[in-house]
């Protein structure tokens, strides 16, 4: 911030120069005016002396006229080049008052409407944080400086979760949803923070948030993981396995969290077997759809993908010994 204030001070000096230079010029004009008045007084004194000398008979009329003319020439020579003083309509105190008010008002208005805090935050974020607490403090200052930034609030909520401050994270994610809209990812983060803030007690609020998130996006990973955790804590191991399997299918093959997630699935399967249950494996059917050459010629790479969902056929009766089915 030092370089900023130096630049601001330089601009302020330039602005003050426009106010103070006329005042300095006015003082110079005043000195010229005083000099002119002195010359006039000397001229009048010289003329008076000549008049006294004529009255005493020392000078005749011609000599008097010559003396007056010489004194007048001297007066003109002394006052030559002196500009006529211009009277200021603003008065002398006003420029000094303006020179005082301009910097004061400039600083006050900048501190109120300016963005010095944002400039300082930009400088801070250009340097790597020394700790997680340092990063959280920076994000808190950023959220205070930009309370309408949904992105800043989102990262602040994630930082709170990393520090096990789930109650604070839940409040921040609620504000984020209010600003950015009810996006599935934000709803999932809010539900997760609220669940841990409630000491891992499943509540209708958390259920509503996860339901809404998965309705908008059935692949929303935070909600799937949270539902799996809640099912495992509630000893509903088959549900936990199902949710975590759905989550596992969304993770990239190189994702490091796949190992931990698979360990959770195996742990849930062991618990299910220990309680006398069996792990239900869902049947997966792979369907390959191929287009004819004529159909391929009419398609483009940007065309939408068609999803096929198989449905069980139910018998409706027999005709000629053959069973009839309907969907």
Curated annotation (Swiss-Prot):
Signal peptide: none annotated. Pfam families: TPR_CcmH_CycH. It comes from the Bacteria. Its main location: membrane. TPR repeats lie at residues 150-183, 221-254. Keywords: Cell inner membrane, Cell membrane, Cytochrome c-type biogenesis, Membrane, Repeat, TPR repeat, Transmembrane, Transmembrane helix. GO terms for cellular component: plasma membrane. The chain crosses the membrane at residues 4-24, 94-114. InterPro entries: C-type_cytochrome_biogenesis, Cyt_c_biogenesis_CcmI, TPR-like_helical_dom_sf, TPR_CcmH_CycH, TPR_rpt. SMART domains: TPR. One of its GO terms (biological process) is cytochrome complex assembly. It is found in: Cell inner membrane. It is a multi-pass membrane protein. Required for the biogenesis of c-type cytochromes. Possible subunit of a heme lyase. Belongs to the CycH family. This is Cytochrome c-type biogenesis protein CycH. It comes from Pseudomonas fluorescens. The gene is cycH.
